Amino acid sequence: MSLPNSSCLLEDKMCESNKTTMASPQLMPLVVVLSTICLVTVGLNLLVLYAVRSERKLHTVGNLYIVSLSVADLIVGAVVMPMNILYLLMSKWSLGRPLCLFWLSMDYVASTASIFSVFILCIDRYRSVQQPLRYLKYRTKTRASATILGAWFLSFLWVIPILGWNHFMQQTSVRREDKCETDFYDVTWFKVMTAIINFYLPTLLMLWFYAKIYKAVRQHCQHRELINGSLPSFSEIKLRPENPKGDAKKPGKESPWEVLKRKPKDAGGGSVLKSPSQTPKEMKSPVVFSQEDDREVDKLHCFPLDIVHMQTAAEGSSRDYVAVNQSHGQLKTDEQGLNTHGASEISEDQMLGDSQSFSRTDSDTTTETASGKGKLRSGSNTGLGYIKFTWKRLRSHSRQYVSGLHMNRERKAAKQLGFIMAAFILCWIPYFIFFMVIAFCKNCCNEHLHMFTIWLGYINSTLNPLIYPLCNENFKKTFKRILHIRS
């Protein structure tokens, strides 16, 4: 039995002069294998679409491009592959011209949409990595959907030459009724042009984009490692009051938030914490919170900005308290009843660009005088400016934190994109290389090799849904839940 050539993206029966024969018993094992590939392709892509629909964690903008790719792959598996197998079995086309045109249209449109879906997915990852915060404003489901519709619209443009080539070119091509092929199958210039637009140009651009993505992610990871090596995380910061008596409970073990929340106690042991509207009546001897090194000071701007004024209930109490104040460019923390000698301070000029510091002074007595109250009010006003400054710093570092989280997600997404692109190029490039050869040399064609390159391109639609759970934990968990697979 004569082995027919199959129609595929940019290919229509160009190997007529090199036909080979194959007996029907020899053909059946191949048909079984190809049919299995077809069923697996349909099943896996349906699983991807159902997973995205049923799992809220997968309702992301990035996964809209995955859905577009899965729809294209589903069309390849549900329409293009089965009709190719049928054509292979029949050895000739006997289903009529309308069904032939439908098959050719689905083949061209789905294959092109699959390529364009990978392309716009690559662009999305590129912009997310290169401009993470700026692109977040524009990375909406509406814009992503519009981009996807644009890609599918361009793919459907294939219908125009498939259905109306003779009408637009005002020519009549000789067509064999037992073959399913386009009217432009022997027009070399058109096929070369469409090959460049459909494959070679998008592939080169994707490789360039991915090189930029890889470089940006690598630089970001190195930058984060450098920061993490020089600046501790918020949970690692320790503010420790100097305690010459060596109390059993070391304040240095407390987190910054716990230190700020520590309440003063009255003579009877009761805690007193007054609202910010109340002015402290007394300021006992101030004490510094010592740091291991200067680099930790910069993290103090991450304090929650619930600044409170605290006051001792009874004069002469030996209980300690903390008050946040700023005077003459210094941030002081005060503790009552602690006598220290010798002043020391930690500068953070290099970290914050000003002269804020933690200081310890040698005073163990404080009298409630009018001048003292005036200084407190002045310090309170100055502290207000510090709060504004701190809030700006907090917002700046919050943006950096959000950017860091976003980059971590994009690093995983870049890994997924890398696998998708590798599968795409490995599956399609043999066919397009072979296509360019036979476009200029119609006799340089081996039918078996040609069929192999065609189906290798189709198999890309089978591999794509296997890549998603491999590189995405949410996909993996959702697949296991749907298939009732225990971890």
UniProtKB/Swiss-Prot annotation:
List all disulphide bridges recorded for this chain. Answer: 100-180, 441-444
| Residue stretches spanning the membrane | 30-50, 65-89, 98-123, 145-164, 189-211, 417-440, 447-469
Q: Biased composition, Basic and acidic residues: where in the chain?
A: 238-261
User: Keywords in UniProt for this one?
Assistant: Cell membrane, Disulfide bond, G-protein coupled receptor, Glycoprotein, Membrane, Phosphoprotein, Receptor, Transducer, Transmembrane, Transmembrane helix
- Extracellular compartment residues: 1-29, 90-97, 165-188, 441-446
- List glycan-bearing residues: 5, 18
Write down what this protein is called. Answer: Histamine H1 receptor
Q: Which species expresses this protein natively? A: Gorilla gorilla gorilla
Q: What is the lineage of its organism?
A: Eukaryota, Metazoa, Chordata, Craniata, Vertebrata
Designated gene of the protein: HRH1
